[in-house]
UniProtKB/Swiss-Prot annotation:
Catalyzes the transfer of the gamma-phosphate of ATP to D-galactose to form alpha-D-galactose-1-phosphate (Gal-1-P). Its EC number is 2.7.1.6. This is Galactokinase. Pfam families: GalKase_gal_bdg, GHMP_kinases_C, GHMP_kinases_N. It comes from Escherichia coli O17:K52:H18 (strain UMN026 / ExPEC).
Length: 382
């Protein structure tokens, strides 16, 4: 049973009438451009064919009822006429409440809604299940009430909800790609202007995501430390963000910087340049160059930004040994565990899967999870 059929059936059973709309918003994987988003830089993600799906209908009052199919059909209910506050027990409900609350601040011309939510974006894998949920809820209200909001505004609203209501720091990339993703394309995003450019993906290439299943423990504290180090670097150059520093300017004075800060800055500057070049390589179908850029990105994250772990490095090495210069592989996401992403000719996927199955657990004691994805369409009706 598809997520659409599942949520429609649950909706009819729970609320006693049929849903009028079904909306989806996808998760994402970032192909290249790591930790560049909060430095006003470039990222190159694609939406994937794992998504949050919501069957829904407008109400003629100001009540919101939400059922979470993936959390034992827990039900949350709140009113648009009262101040929206955090739910005491259901963390999932706070993503919904946050999106609705921040949408009220942008455009208060919507009424109540009934929703049933389900999704298959793996949670805790760094594939943006939370952004997918935020964008899906925003799109529900936009579609049901014909709100004059575009995808970028729905994305910004989701980011605000996560930062201010849920209380989790995040850049804008995850929500933007979920809202604006394009089938068979990646999206080059300028995180300063929020300008986007669709980049066609070569035919016959699979997007493979492998979860190391190494439990991320340092990610929060270390993430904040990296942000502070980048801000220190930008201040040294008297610029608003590292986006505004050239590699030549950096090389001329790198010896004057704190050595750790210098390494962090070098990663951001080189990663930004790699990301822009990667978009061109992809568009030209140059998988060999894309693979080189992904390898350089991984080495930079490992040696300069220091956010990889041995388990992730092992996974990357296993995959690279199989694909050689026919594709690319690197860690993706915040670091300290999580996933790797690989661009692999479809005919090599079975060999990669076999090599990883034979070697990764033997070397690390952890079993991986393997996902083969397609670059998919952003949020909308399904």
């Amino acid at each position: 049973m598809s997520l659409k059929e599942k949520t429609q059936s649950l909706f009819a059973n729970a609320f006693g009438y049929p849903a009028t709309h079904t909306i989806q918003a996808p998760g994402r994987v970032n192909l290249i451009g790591e930790h560049t988003d909060y430095n006003d830089g470039f990222v190159l993600p694609c939406a994937i064919d794992y998504q949050t799906v919501i069957s829904c209908a407008p109400r003629d009052d100001h009540k919101v009822r939400v059922m979470a199919a993936d959390y034992e059909n827990q039900l949350d209910e709140f009113s648009l006429d009262a101040p929206i506050v955090a739910h005491e027990n259901y963390q999932w409900a706070n993503y919904v409440r946050g999106v609705v609350k921040h949408l009220q601040l942008r455009n208060n011309s919507f009424g109540g809604v009934d929703m049933v939510i389900s999704g298959n974006v793996p949670q805790g894998a760094g594939l943006s299940s939370s952004a997918s949920l935020e964008v899906a809820v925003g799109t529900v209200l936009q579609q049901l009430y014909h709100l004059p909001l575009d995808g970028a505004q729905i994305a910004l609203n989701g980011q605000e909800a996560e930062n201010q209501f849920v209380g989790c720091n995040c850049g804008i990339m995850d929500q933007l790609i979920s809202a604006l993703g394009k089938k068979d394309h990646a999206l080059l995003i300028d995180c300063r202007s929020l300008g986007t450019k669709a980049v066609s993906m070569p035919k016959g290439v699979a997007v493979v995501i492998i979860n190391s299943n190494f439990k991320r423990t340092l990610v929060g504290s270390e993430y904040n430390t990296r942000r502070e180090q980048c801000e220190t670097g930008a201040r040294f150059f008297q610029q608003p963000a590292l986006r505004d520093v050239t590699i030549e300017e950096f090389n001329a004075v790198a010896h004057e910087l704190d050595p750790i800060v210098a390494k962090r800055v070098r990663h951001i500057l080189t990663e930004n340049a790699r990301t822009v070049e990667a978009a061109s390589a992809l568009e030209q179908g140059d998988l060999k160059r894309m693979g080189e850029l992904m390898a350089e990105s991984h080495a930079s994250m490992r040696d300069d930004f220091e956010i990889t772990v041995p388990q992730i490095d092992t996974l990357v090495e296993i995959v690279k040994a199989v694909i050689g210069d026919k594709g690319g592989v690197r860690m993706t996401g915040g670091g300290f565990g999580g996933c790797i992403v690989a661009l692999i000719p479809e005919e090599l996927v079975p060999a990669v899967q076999q090599a990883v199955a034979e070697q990764y657990e033997a070397k690390t004691g952890i079993k991986e999870t393997f996902y083969v994805c397609k670059p998919s369409q952003g949020a909308g009706q399904c």
